[in-house]
Amino acid sequence: MTYDMKKYIRTDLEGFAGYSACKAPELVKTKNRIIKLDANENLYGAAPTVQKAMSTFDQYHIYPDATQFEIRRLLAEYTGVNMEQIICGAGSDQLIDLLLRLFINPGDEVINCPPTFAMYKFYTDLNRGTVVNVPRDAGYDVNIGGIKNALTPKTKLIFIAAPNNPTGTAISKEDIRQILDLGVPTVIDEAYYEFTGQTMVTDMPSYPNLMILRTFSKWAGLAGLRVGYGLFPPVIADYLSRIKDPYSVNIAADAAVRQTMLQREYMLETVKKIVDERKRLYTELSKFSWLKPYPSAANFILCKLLKGKAKDVQQALESQGILVRCFDAPMMENCLRFSVGKPEDTDALLKALGEMGE
């Protein structure tokens, strides 16, 4: 007997495109050393104590603490926010999904400011919300007037990445406050906070509609373990704690985060190195007549190609073992994004780009 399983699938997901993730290094065909500059990871890796803890840990057969008590205690110390207001998850992606599940009824509207992090739209679509795009201006700054004009009675959430991914654009606290003053629940995604030092945490008592997301993927070298956290008003944290998966942070990630927080000064030193290297990379990229780099407050630099095709450059770099991200979406046509690595990674990238321009 033949069954048509498709007829049982949600009709709104029939054309769902999914997310295009970065290529795994083991899938790259090259004889060269892989230099991974496509996913904004910390190429210095996790703290040595994390790696040592992982090699000696012997509790993998035990379920993790569903409340993430110790992680939240350490994060409360780090952020200055009460641990009851902290929710942890399997990456900040999971928290984005949870927020949309909590706030969105089918047809409710979510304000998105493209070009920006794709997961805001991804999870809004998945949760049957309606994405209302308010495009950024030519310099990739948020259009605050456009956000105000886009508000309707159906508006339930606003997402703002600060700084923005994939453009690296910063947004001032004053501009964020203008958005918060609209009174709509607003998510400020501080995934790259450690690279810029600007946070809205101290504004939380003044804005009960302010929610902040962060991650251990970018600064802490734990991208492969998938750990993120959010800082929420008490009432929202309470609801999220009820609907989240009970074991959303696995026991290996739990142990790694504890060690990272105990060794955070070590990791923050690597952040300083990356910020210094970002300045050098921006200066050097500016010397190429066929590249237009944009200022960045994160750990990557976006470049628009003024000559040639970004896809061709991406493929040429990949053939040499250098992985970078290519974009061709609206307002991102013919763009490449370079993660900032170690000095030797920058040297290899600049050498390869220089040879292409000859």
From Swiss-Prot:
PANTHER family: HISTIDINOL-PHOSPHATE AMINOTRANSFERASE, HISTIDINOL-PHOSPHATE AMINOTRANSFERASE-RELATED. The modification N6-(pyridoxal phosphate)lysine is found at residue 218. Pfam families: Aminotran_1_2. One of its GO terms (molecular function) is histidinol-phosphate transaminase activity. The gene is hisC. The lineage of its organism: Bacteria, Bacillati, Chloroflexota, Dehalococcoidia, Dehalococcoidales. Coiled coil: none annotated. One of its GO terms (biological process) is L-histidine biosynthetic process. The keyword ATP-binding does not apply. It catalyses: L-histidinol phosphate + 2-oxoglutarate = 3-(imidazol-4-yl)-2-oxopropyl phosphate + L-glutamate. Its cofactor is pyridoxal 5'-phosphate. Its EC number is 2.6.1.9. It comes from Dehalococcoides mccartyi (strain ATCC BAA-2266 / KCTC 15142 / 195) (Dehalococcoides ethenogenes (strain 195)). The keyword Transit peptide does not apply. Belongs to the class-II pyridoxal-phosphate-dependent aminotransferase family. Histidinol-phosphate aminotransferase subfamily. Homodimer. CDD domains: AAT_like. Pathway: Amino-acid biosynthesis; L-histidine biosynthesis; L-histidine from 5-phospho-alpha-D-ribose 1-diphosphate: step 7/9. This is Histidinol-phosphate aminotransferase. Keywords: Amino-acid biosynthesis, Aminotransferase, Histidine biosynthesis, Pyridoxal phosphate, Transferase. It is an enzyme of class 2 (transferase).
